[in-house]
């Protein structure tokens, strides 16, 4: 649904494409308990793309780093397929050679340490998805 409003299909922008960044910033300014759930729901089955999905990815990463317990609580309610889909979207990097990009590595390390400190098993899931993305980017 997210891309139906904020995405791009072929050469055509969707109705809210031009305001995607502002809308995500507005969402981030809301009440955190409601915001976490809404952004989590958007990210569960999201697929990375430039612009709006990228803005969403960055917003959710910020929330994970600030509210890891809340995100982990939501993830524990989901099945493994959704958990993997969520982390794949969060960790995805659209470039060959992701393993050599220091900014990407730093972001992964921040997420990994933040999550594994709270939940070792989920930290291993994060590590596994990261390694899969690295292999796929070669």
Describe each model-derived feature in a short phrase.
Residues 33-38, 44, 48-138:
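Extended alpha-helical scaffolding segments
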Residues 1-31, 118-122, 126, 137-138:
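Terminal domain-start segments
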């Amino acid at each position: 649904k997210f891309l139906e409003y904020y995405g791009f299909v072929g050469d055509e922008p969707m109705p809210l494409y031009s305001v995607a960044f502002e809308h995500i910033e507005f969402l981030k300014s809301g009440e955190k308990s409601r915001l976490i759930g809404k952004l989590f729901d958007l990210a569960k089955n999201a697929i990375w793309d430039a612009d709006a999905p990228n803005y969403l990815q960055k917003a959710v990463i910020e929330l994970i780093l600030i509210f890891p317990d809340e995100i982990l609580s939501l993830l524990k309610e989901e099945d493994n397929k959704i958990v993997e889909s969520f982390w794949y979207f969060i960790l995805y990097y659209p470039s060959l050679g992701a393993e050599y990009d220091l900014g990407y590595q730093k972001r992964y390390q921040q997420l990994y340490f933040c999550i594994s400190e709270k939940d070792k098993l989920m930290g291993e899931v994060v590590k596994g998805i990261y390694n899969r993305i690295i292999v796929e980017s070669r």
